[in-house]
């Protein structure tokens, strides 16, 4: 069977990349943004960095902030109603995986109304139409949700997370601007960075891995290993390198999948609301030891 890779996206990298947003909005013929961003990012002025750019370009938007760190079915359902009422025709998702995953799920339901129950999206590509266009602006260097084909939603009632996978749902534009990450505290930088490292390591040893994805994952491991400590100290070069490293890891694992570190981390997050990167960091060494005999020369 042939190997396949999906890289259907325009991405901007580097300090000041958010200034590219108005040009992309105009290039795609978009009108009003539905800005998905969590309450803390709004409170501390991170979201405002982007809305200031929109204001300067006289672009219309509405902000939606009912987003939890592990986004829930309720976050998506209320978001669908708010999007319909807003008159928006695209998303700007500002945040970590929570904001971007919420935007993906809302957009899929908007364009596929037969899947109004978000739980029906679980699995691989059940829908016929892609999500509403998303411009993704990550504020953490970890999830790589801005470049991946999947999104994760929490079912509070059943205390589980479910994964939805569809190549049609990659954001049309990724704005990977390290200045959007400069206010991350030490602990969040470390935990999201460990999420990125886990992506790179697990993607490298999956059964679906091949030469092209190995190239992404090896480079991601190299970049993350040299830059995570510096990023935790808020070094600008460390921030920039981590932003790139986590994106490269996302390009890889989005095409070949992950492993049991992530499976167990999602379970912990669903039951205990454990921060995803923290769960990965705890589990990764034990899983690497468990997998060692099966990884050949890759370790």
Model-identified regions with their sequence ranges:
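Carboxylate- and glycine-rich phosphate/diphosphate-binding segment that chelates Mg2+/Mn2+
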Residues: 150-256
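Glycine/threonine-rich beta-strand-loop-alpha-helix active-site module
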Residues: 74-176
